[in-house]
Amino acid sequence: MFYWLYRHLEINILQYISVRAGISFFIAFVLTMYLMPKFIRWARAKKASQPIYELAPENHKIKAGTPTMGGVVFIFSTIIATVLTAKLNNFYIVGGILTLALFSLIGIQDDYSKISKEKNSAGLTPRMKLIFQFLCAASIAGILFLYGHSTELFTPFYKFPLFEMGVFGIVFWMFVIVGSSNAVNLTDGLDGLATVPSILAFSTLSILVYVVGHAVFANYLLFPNIQIAGELAIMGSAICGALIAFLWFNSHPAEVFMGDSGSLPLGAFMGYLAIVAKSEILLLAIGFIFVWETVSVILQVGSYKLRQKRVFLMAPIHHHFEQKGWKENKIIVRFWIIAFMSNLIALLSLKIR
């Protein structure tokens, strides 16, 4: 809509991505702040709360009854803000909206299964969830490939591509999207723990897609120039605004959880932005907290299956620190600090190449 105003009413300031990114940020923020209290009241009335895992640390029992599925609100706000401010004839914007929508639907189904009175109180089975995720990721990766998105693989701090992936890029992109989606999902175990690292990651990724989409900046900073990709910075800005508003309600003690309907699309969209920005490997630094949490689970499960011994007191690793006696707030803030530092390191790749 705002770009239409520029085209038809000649409001020139609205042609700039930076301006529309700022507008999308505030639209998503205000919309989430307005809708979230209404959603929380509705969810409490419907008793839409996720059961607490029986093996969770004892202090988690007080979280019983906290509404879940808050992700529906901030994903909805992000999409609305994007529709109002971005060019809807932009291929990458359409792909971003599709990514959020598809993975949000998977999360909604999983959350609904958990809070309903069905026998499957654990939600979708891990196998079914993974199948749906790979099907959605395959659709997105396939569309990117058919559109002609570059399949060159770049590494941080090096200006030349490592190699051309060709059609195998589809498989690689699928794993980036699904892996990122599940990594954020695993991290979402404490109040606000996944929210702030997500805000930081989307801020960094928004800068990166803006750079690769800008011919002058991409050339100066020795990045590949991905035409029209810069428009995705508007969508990244919108999701940051929505998440900051969500943090108002999700900070400790949380009034609402994002649920799988929030964490799955967040992670998938992170992967999508990294693919578009040709920063798939750099995503390991951008989302270091999410990687750390995922690796802790892999090590725990692998060690127990191979040696019948556990590496950590409990996995994901934030539960390990809880079992060691760390207070929830201390764990959360320390993880935020690590996320902040890892994103600063990732941003160094803009200049050091």
UniProtKB/Swiss-Prot annotation:
Membrane association type: Multi-pass membrane protein
GO molecular function: metal ion binding; phospho-N-acetylmuramoyl-pentapeptide-transferase activity; UDP-N-acetylmuramoyl-L-alanyl-D-glutamyl-meso-2,6-diaminopimelyl-D-alanyl-D-alanine:undecaprenyl-phosphate transferase activity
Family membership noted in the UniProt record: Belongs to the glycosyltransferase 4 family. MraY subfamily.
Catalytic activity field: UDP-N-acetyl-alpha-D-muramoyl-L-alanyl-gamma-D-glutamyl-meso-2,6-diaminopimeloyl-D-alanyl-D-alanine + di-trans,octa-cis-undecaprenyl phosphate = di-trans,octa-cis-undecaprenyl diphospho-N-acetyl-alpha-D-muramoyl-L-alanyl-D-glutamyl-meso-2,6-diaminopimeloyl-D-alanyl-D-alanine + UMP
NCBIfam families assigned: mraY
EC number: 2.7.8.13
Protein name (record): Phospho-N-acetylmuramoyl-pentapeptide-transferase
Listed HAMAP family: MraY
Keywords from the UniProt entry: Cell cycle, Cell division, Cell inner membrane, Cell membrane, Cell shape, Cell wall biogenesis/degradation, Magnesium, Membrane, Metal-binding, Peptidoglycan synthesis, Transferase, Transmembrane, Transmembrane helix
EC class of the enzyme, as a word: transferase
Cofactor(s) demanded: Mg(2+)
